[in-house]
């Protein structure tokens, strides 16, 4: 598991909202903290919304959006399968978005 990996994450049936039932996510935990029992992830969506907290990317030939405004911690036991890695240019854009989103 590494920062910027796409992972399929086990859906949580206890939550009713679609965003809460994770699915495809991107790991955003810094590499220095990757050995912790839970990781920070940003879920993906195919719904386009003009929000500054959404980062556009391509996944398996389809356009998607990383939802920085929906970041949450997920236990490693919920990670099902690695599906790929973000392209370098999208990694840079995501880091810029994270810095802006969490600016104090």
PLM ranges: what are they?
Residues 1-104:
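Conserved functional hotspots at enzyme active or ligand-binding sites that engage polyanionic ligands
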């Amino acid at each position: 598991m590494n920062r910027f990996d796409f992972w399929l994450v086990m859906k949580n049936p206890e939550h009713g909202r679609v965003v809460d039932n994770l699915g495809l996510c991107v790991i955003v935990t810094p590499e220095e903290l990757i050995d912790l029992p839970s990781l920070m992830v940003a879920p993906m969506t195919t719904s386009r919304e003009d929000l500054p907290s959404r980062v556009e990317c391509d996944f398996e030939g389809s356009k998607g959006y990383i939802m920085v405004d929906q970041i949450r911690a997920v236990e490693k036991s919920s990670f099902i399968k690695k599906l790929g890695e973000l392209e370098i240019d999208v990694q840079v854009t995501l880091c810029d978005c994270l810095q802006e989103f969490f600016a104090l």
